[in-house]
């Protein structure tokens, strides 16, 4: 199985909302090696070898990683503006929903791949969506995000052990309080 976390490369983006996918994978591993246009780490979950992938293209070109990787057994983890901070949503497939990284992946492999959407919304009305996803989380949001990242890593382990259907039933109804 391959787990791909979406984000933008570089220190400038490391704490931005758009880099939630990278943050989840960094929680699973802190040892990364260079691939052709990605970083990877091999981990073990319940005896199964899992390859973690962080594309080193910018978000809008995330699909290019599939020039080098198989795509028959993957999960993609990424930020979702339409979900509130404190929620994740596991899906077997679907559209891009306006997310350019997912749009890029769909252009390479189609939309039939499992994903974990990580809520980063709601976006304030007076901020452009592109500016919002490239902004850093606040200190208060990071406290919630830490719990969400833990929930995502737990969900990935659960998918490996029990399958996507059981994981959807277990995790899609969980909401971590933001205190708002």
UniProtKB/Swiss-Prot annotation:
The enzyme's E.C. designation: 3.1.1.29
Keyword RNA-binding in annotation: yes
InterPro entries per record: Pept_tRNA_hydro, Pept_tRNA_hydro_CS, Pept_tRNA_hydro_sf
GO biological process annotation, one example: rescue of stalled ribosome
Reactions catalysed: an N-acyl-L-alpha-aminoacyl-tRNA + H2O = an N-acyl-L-amino acid + a tRNA + H(+)
GO cellular component, as recorded: cytoplasm
Keywords, comma-separated and alphabetical: Cytoplasm, Hydrolase, RNA-binding, tRNA-binding
Localization terms from the record: Cytoplasm
CDD domains: PTH (cd00462)
Gene3D superfamilies, A to Z: Peptidyl-tRNA hydrolase
Binding site for tRNA: 13, 58, 60, 100
Alphabetical list of NCBIfam families matching this protein: pth
Subunit (UniProt): Monomer.
Listed name of the protein: Peptidyl-tRNA hydrolase
Organism for this UniProt entry: Fervidobacterium nodosum (strain ATCC 35602 / DSM 5306 / Rt17-B1)
Lineage start: Bacteria, Thermotogati, Thermotogota, Thermotogae, Thermotogales
């Amino acid at each position: 199985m391959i787990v791909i976390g979406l984000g933008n490369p570089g220190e400038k983006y490391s704490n931005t909302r758009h880099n939630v996918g990278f943050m989840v994978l960094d929680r699973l591993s802190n040892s990364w090696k260079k691939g052709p246009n990605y970083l990877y780490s091999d981990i073990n979950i319940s005896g199964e070898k899992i390859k973690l992938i962080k594309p080193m293209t910018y978000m809008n070109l995330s699909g290019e990683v599939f020039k080098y990787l198989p795509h028959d057994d993957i999960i993609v983890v990424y930020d979702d503006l339409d979900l509130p901070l404190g929620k994740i949503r596991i899906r077997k497939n679907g559209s891009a929903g306006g997310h350019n990284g997912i749009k890029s992946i769909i252009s390479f492999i189609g939309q039939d791949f499992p994903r974990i959407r990580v809520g980063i919304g709601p976006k304030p009305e007076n901020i452009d969506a592109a500016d919002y996803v490239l902004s850093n989380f606040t200190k208060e949001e990071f406290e919630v995000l830490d719990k969400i990242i833990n929930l995502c890593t737990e969900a990935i382990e659960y998918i490996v052990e029990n399958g996507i259907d059981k994981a959807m039933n277990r995790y899609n109804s969980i909401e971590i309080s933001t205190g708002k």
